[in-house]
Amino acid sequence: ESEDGFFIMPTKILNDASVLDYKCVILPGIINPLPALYDEKIITFLKQVKNTNVLIAAISAAPLLLAKAGLLDDVKFTAGFFMQMIDVFPFIHRENFVHQPLVEEKRIITAIGFAFREFAMAVLKSLGYDVEDKFMWPIEKAYSEKELTFYWNDSDYQEFLKELEEY
């Protein structure tokens, strides 16, 4: 189930899937990325994307999974996560993080959760679909870096660190 309550019906389990069977892999938004982040089956599956022509798209906190799989080592990206995560997870490269609603680079599309329209448009266009610029009324506001930078308050950060210890 996605963070917005969408249910996703898989057609294969990861053990039976190869990333090469797909033109595109989309990672939906997740409120709590920790279970997926520490699921080696997911990370191993994602690692298969490296050096392929498979489009990979991740929104909200899901780019964390791409980072752990090493797919963002030399790629600019964005994500809807708290900046303290950059200090906690060594696989997130601060120099590659961009404060933008959507970032596309090297067949990887990442977005902050509220930019779901732009995310959908970018995925469709990358797959060769003819999509009008006003498809689903994309965001027209320019956001400042400050508006796109998220921090936990001290108590929420401590709660996250405590939860992280369980992994």
Question: Which role does the model predict for each range below?
Answer:
Residues 6-57, 61-167:
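Active-site-adjacent pocket-lining segments in enzyme domains
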Residues 1-4:
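Membrane-interfacial amphipathic helices and adjacent loop/beta segments
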